[in-house]
C-alpha cells in the first residue's frame, strides 16, 4: 500500500537527484520505488530485525542498507541529494530528539537537496495503533518553524486523510541555531 498510494503523494513533482537517503526504511516498503527514481539508495534502519528483512528483500548493488540512528548519522556533510523519512519522526521519544534528527537531515543533505517526509496526525486511532511503542506526533502547525530553525527553506506542509507530508529544501545558509551559537561565541 505504501508504494501505491503514499509514495506518489510524497515524491511526485520533486527532483530527488542521484542519491537518496531513506531513514527508517523498515522492511523496505518504499525502497524499491525509490530505486526506480534514483541511481543510488542508502537505507538507514534502527531496528536490527527490520534491517535483516530489508537486506533479504532488497539485495541490489545500488542499495546500501545500514543500521543507524537518525539523531546521529554516520555520513559526511552533504552526502545525499535528498532524504526521505516516512512515518519516522513520531517514533522518537522527545521533541529534542526529533529536532536533532531534523538537524542531522539538514547536515547530510547537499545544498539545494530535498527533505521529504510523511507523518500521521494525532488522534485516538493512531495512539491506539502505537500503544506498545513510542508515539510522539509531530504537530503540523509547528513543523514549518522547526524546519526553518534547522535551516530549511521552501517548507510546505500538506494534509491528506489523517496524515501530512513535509517538503523542505536545504538552503545554502547556516541554520538559525548555528547563527545563534556563533553570535553567542563571538560575544563571549
Provide a role label for each language-model segment.
Residues 84-85:
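A conserved beta-strand element that flanks and buttresses the S-adenosyl-L-methionine
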Residues 19, 112-114:
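Short glycine-centered segments of the SAM/dcSAM-binding site in methyltransferase folds
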Amino acid at each position: 500500500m505504501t508504494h501505491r498510494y503514499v509514495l506518489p503523494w510524497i515524491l511526485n513533482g520533486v527532483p530527488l537527484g542521484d542519491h537518496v537517503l531513506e531513514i527508517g526504511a523498515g522492511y523496505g516498503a518504499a525502497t524499491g520505488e525509490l530505486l526506480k527514481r534514483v541511481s543510488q539508495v542508502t537505507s538507514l534502519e534502527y531496528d536490527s530485525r527490520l534491517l535483516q528483512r530489508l537486506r533479504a528483500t532488497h539485495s541490489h548493488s545500488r542499495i546500501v542498507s545500514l543500521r543507524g540512528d537518525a539523531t546521529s548519522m554516520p555520513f559526511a556533510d552533504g552526502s545525499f541529494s535528498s532524504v526521505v523519512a516516512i512515518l519516522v519522526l513520531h517514533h522518537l521519544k522527545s521533541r529534542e530528539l526529533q529536532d536533532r534528527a531534523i538537524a542531522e537531515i539538514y547536515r547530510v543533505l547537499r545544498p539545494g537537496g530535498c527533505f521529504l517526509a510523511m507523518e500521521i496526525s494525532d488522534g485516538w486511532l493512531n495512539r491506539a495503533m502505537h500503544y506498545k511503542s513510542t508515539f510522539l506526533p509531530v504537530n503540523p502547525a509547528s513543523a514549518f518553524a522547526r524546519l526553518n530553525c534547522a535551516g530549511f527553506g521552501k517548507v510546505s506542509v500538506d494534509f491528506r486523510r489523517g496524515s501530512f507530508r513535509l517538503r523542505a529544501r536545504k538552503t545554502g545558509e547556516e541554520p538559525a541555531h548555528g547563527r545563534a551559537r556563533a553570535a553567542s561565541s563571538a560575544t563571549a
